[in-house]
């Protein structure tokens, strides 16, 4: 009997399924998408009903050849990609490509929500057909994003600079961040006061707060004139200190708290950001590994959680039975909620998949600890705890509120104090969380104090109505209203979800794009828009009326949902979208200002709402008196004189402002050349350095390293060797492109020792005969093929000779982030991304003696640095040629 062929996306998933299905099935991986729109050109024929022109992705020819070979003689080909739009599209593309080569095979869709033996065997035993409505929704989204991405980005290139980009959802997310920052800048803090007190009864003290004055409730938000000044607050304090404190009422209420539902994708992303400090991308990468399966010793490979891309809170009946039995066994019958708790679905939820939950209640976190990485265990514990607590009894607290009158005999003034105490009577579902639940909100600006004292925490002594209490202290405490907080990843995801922008499965990519494009940066895990990001938003708002509004983007998502549900044809949805888009695009082409020749600063202020000039120089050049213009160059935005080249005045617009860097350790530094004081500066690229205050007469600079917001100088370091040309010591210098060795007699002696050829040990994936070497370009080290110029293949990140555990690509890239080193697969559709500690360490780069690779590199050949990656500070743009070596 011929084997059936099962195709999944990743090798890890394939290994797991192969163990479940046995010898009658051949399980292979397609490594994600096999076809897509070409990288160059729009490749959408509007005249033929938006017909897309797909092509096999580079590197997938060999994968498809292996799949065709594996399918020879197979009676059935099971397409078992993920159960969502992207997975459905992968299955459809596979069928379209493989069907001509396997005419006798029957193509069936195998779909499962969890990778367990029972779920997989059931899916293969009862396969279905490819859902063409899902495929249509994916095609519509892909085509819309291609039209917007190419045509709006092309507009930015023509008006501003080559390399800028915009996107249907990415630009809306960026706009949200920019508008929040503008709101913060316009915010004016308002001072106000409160009067916290400490009361006592029989030597037991407890906190209270003045909440009433002259019989009216006080407002603690800066709007109450009765507490607007310290003098007014001190008058209240004086009254309380001279008053008798009599208890007016004591009220005890019982409050029940029900647990939150099991995780949806967005809620998991938010909780992981708040509780674990994970980025959205990191959360999804770890969840993917938990879903695809982990080797659990004698148990074999098991998928630990259900599919992690879902907006549903629904749970399978058998899972509900299992979790309630687990609660009963661990905490007793009283801990189980009397009724099975079923959570209401949010409006617009697809409900195609279950909520994210453990696949087996027989695998608590303690049972799998030794098989998981640190990140995997943390996230699995979060999913486990959330699911278990969702079927537990409510927590019960008793809240006691004591209202107290402060009155002076013979006077009309009366102050009202309130003390609140909370006692947890039954932990209920909180037992599963140990300390605290994961529903702590990240947002909130801290405005307002509330009526209770110290938020009602703690126990109060026994107090009865009519009793007199003692006063320990009463003070006037100053406050200021706070601006709305910046968005972190969790709060931005929450905002996007609540407003229907994008889908949870796309949030990680959206946040990655706006950060990689250098449109935002992070400070204290919060997004701050860069000058470039502000400019892009202003240009989009100027050129497009409502195309990048949250409401329009949300309506577009609803239409894609209708396509998936089968109530709207995908071509009709595209036609409606494109009709408006073409009109908006042409209007923007005429309306949008151009920065190609520079834009006068006076016009910048009139035109742009969100763009801000740090260290604003005014409208005229301080050297020539001509107008100043905003311009865009290879290193980013800057200000220049309109009289150029007669006047060479320029001013940088740094991404990180000097006042955000702690330069306390650099105070008192003097110039080695002229003795003048040195001052912290930031260049156009955002890099910090010490510059001589005697500039331009003295141009001496010292590189500065900024880490954690703190700056430290990096002076030259002697190597212990002498210059062969002049005899002076050789030193390690710290240039803008990295460290290098040179003569300390520079500039009189320009000797620099030749660099050895350094290989990474990775074979070139393009020409397959060369080797990837370490090279140095104008933007720092990069990695290029030894066969340059015949083969131009290069990398910005360091490749290492280690196969990707997910897709099998024979190398991974090393990326350094604030959280440490990460290993990333660049294969499109793979998305593998893991911390260094999760993988074995790689061998260091091998140094090869000079001339060892002469034959491979070619005499005198110099490989150009790659174009700046999206992670660099500013786009390199058109015409960015590699710096030529002198001599």
Q: Which residues make up each language-model segment?
A:
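C-terminal helical "lid" subdomain and adjoining coupling/linker elements of P-loop NTPases
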Residues: 159, 178-228, 275
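Short helix-coil junctions and helix-kink-helix linkers
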Residues: 267-279, 493-503
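Alpha-helical scaffold elements adjacent to nucleotide-binding pockets in ATP/GTP-utilizing enzyme cores
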Residues: 16-20, 66, 89-97, 119-123, ...
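Intrinsically disordered, low-complexity regulatory segments
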Residues: 1-142, 223-227, 234, 339, ...
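Basic, low-complexity terminal or inter-domain segments flanking catalytic cores
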Residues: 2-5, 16, 23, 97, ...
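C-terminal or mid-to-C-terminal helical accessory/interaction module adjacent to the motor/catalytic core
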Residues: 115-197
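Metal- or metallocofactor-binding catalytic centers and their adjacent structured scaffolds
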Residues: 219-261
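Core structural elements
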Residues: 141-150, 169, 199-201, 255-267, ...
């Amino acid at each position: 009997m011929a084997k059936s062929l099962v195709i999944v996306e990743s090798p890890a998933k394939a290994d797991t399924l192969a163990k479940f299905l046995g010898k009658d099935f051949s399980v292979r991986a397609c490594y994600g998408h096999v076809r897509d729109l070409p990288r160059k050109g729009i490749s959408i024929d509007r005249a033929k009903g938006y017909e897309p022109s797909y092509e096999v992705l580079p590197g997938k020819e060999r994968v498809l050849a292996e799949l065709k070979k594996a399918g020879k003689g197979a009676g059935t080909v099971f397409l078992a990609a993920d159960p969502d739009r992207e997975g459905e599209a992968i299955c459809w593309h596979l069928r379209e490509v493989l069907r001509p080569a396997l005419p006798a095979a029957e193509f069936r869709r195998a779909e499962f929500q969890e990778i367990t033996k029972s779920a997989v065997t059931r899916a293969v035993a009862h396969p279905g057909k490819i859902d063409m409505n899902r495929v249509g929704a994916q095609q519509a989204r892909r085509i819309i994003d291609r039209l917007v991405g190419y045509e709006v980005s092309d507009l930015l290139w023509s008006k501003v600079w080559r390399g800028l980009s915009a996107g249907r959802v990415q630009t809306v997310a960026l706009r949200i961040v920019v508008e929040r920052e503008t709101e913060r800048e316009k915010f004016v803090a308002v001072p106000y006061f409160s009067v916290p007190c400490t009361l006592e009864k029989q030597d037991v003290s407890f906190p209270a707060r003045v909440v009433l004055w002259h019989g009216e409730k006080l407002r603690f938000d800066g709007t109450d004139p009765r507490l607007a000044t310290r003098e007014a607050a001190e008058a209240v304090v004086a009254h309380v200190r001279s008053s008798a404190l009599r208890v007016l009422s004591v009220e005890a209420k019982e409050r029940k708290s029900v647990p939150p539902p099991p995780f949806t994708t967005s809620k998991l992303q938010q909780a992981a950001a708040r509780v674990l400090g994970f980025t959205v991308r990191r959360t999804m990468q770890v969840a993917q590994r938990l879903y695809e399966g982990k080797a659990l010793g004698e148990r074999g490979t098991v998928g630990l959680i259900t599919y992690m891309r879902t907006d549903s809170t629904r749970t399978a009946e058998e899972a509900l039975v299992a979790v309630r039995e687990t609660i009963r066994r661990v905490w007793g019958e009283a801990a189980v909620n009397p009724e099975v708790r079923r959570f209401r679905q949010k409006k617009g939820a697809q409900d195609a998949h279950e909520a994210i939950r453990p696949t087996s209640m027989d695998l608590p976190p303690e049972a799998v600890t030794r098989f998981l990485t640190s990140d995997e265990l943390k996230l699995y514990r979060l999913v486990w705890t959330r699911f278990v607590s969702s079927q537990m009894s409510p927590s019960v607290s008793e809240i006691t509120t004591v209202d107290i009158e402060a009155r002076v005999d013979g006077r009309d003034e009366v102050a009202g104090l309130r003390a609140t105490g909370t006692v947890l009577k039954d932990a209920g579902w909180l037992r599963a969380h140990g300390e605290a639940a994961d529903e702590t909100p990240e947002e909130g600006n801290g405005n307002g104090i509330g009526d209770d004292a110290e938020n009602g925490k703690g126990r109060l002594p026994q107090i009865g109505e009519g009793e007199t209490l003692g006063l320990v202290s009463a003070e006037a405490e100053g406050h200021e209203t706070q601006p709305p907080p910046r968005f972190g990843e969790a709060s931005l995801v929450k905002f996007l979800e609540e407003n229907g922008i994008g889908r949870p499965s796309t949030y990680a990519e959206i946040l990655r794009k706006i950060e990689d494009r250098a449109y935002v940066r992070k400070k204290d895990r919060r997004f701050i828009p860069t000058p470039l990001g502000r400019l892009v938003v202003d240009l989009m708002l100027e050129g497009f009326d409502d195309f990048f509004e949250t409401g329009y983007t949300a309506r577009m998502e609803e239409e894609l949902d209708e396509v998936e549900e089968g109530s709207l044809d995908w071509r009709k949805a595209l036609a409606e979208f494109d009709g408006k888009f073409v009109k908006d695009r042409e209007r923007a082409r005429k309306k949008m200002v151009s920065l190609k020749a520079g834009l006068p600063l006076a016009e910048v202020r009139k035109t742009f709402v969100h763009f801000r000039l740090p260290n604003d120089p005014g409208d005229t050049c301080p050297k020539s008196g001509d107008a100043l213009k905003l311009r865009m160059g290879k290193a980013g935005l800057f200000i220049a004189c309109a009289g150029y080249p007669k006047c060479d005045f320029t001013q940088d617009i740094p991404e990180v402002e000097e006042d955000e860097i702690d330069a306390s350790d650099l105070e008192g530094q003097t110039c080695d050349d002229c003795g003048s004081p040195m001052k912290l500066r930031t260049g156009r690229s955002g890099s910090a350095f010490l510059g001589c205050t005697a500039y331009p007469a003295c141009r001496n600079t010292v590189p500065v390293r900024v880490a954690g917001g703190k700056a430290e100088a990096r002076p030259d370091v002697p190597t212990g060797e002498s210059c062969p040309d002049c005899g002076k010591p050789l030193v390690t210098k710290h240039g803008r492109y990295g460290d290098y060795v040179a003569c300390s007699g520079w500039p009189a002696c320009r000797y620099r020792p030749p660099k050895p050829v350094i290989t990474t040990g990775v074979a070139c994936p393009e020409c397959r005969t060369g080797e990837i070497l370490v090279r140095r370009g104008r933007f720092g080290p990069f990695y290029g093929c030894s066969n340059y110029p015949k083969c131009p293949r290069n990398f910005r990140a360091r490749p290492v000779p280690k196969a990707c555990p997910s897709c099998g690509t024979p190398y991974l890239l090393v990326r350094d982030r604030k959280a440490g080193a990460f290993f990333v697969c660049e294969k499109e559709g793979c998305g593998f991304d893991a911390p260094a500690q999760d993988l074995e360490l790689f061998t260091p780069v091998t140094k090869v003696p000079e001339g060892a690779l002469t034959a491979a590199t070619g005499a005198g050949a110099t490989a150009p640095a790659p174009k700046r990656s999206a992670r660099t500070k500013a786009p390199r743009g058109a015409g960015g040629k590699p710096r030529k070596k002198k001599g």
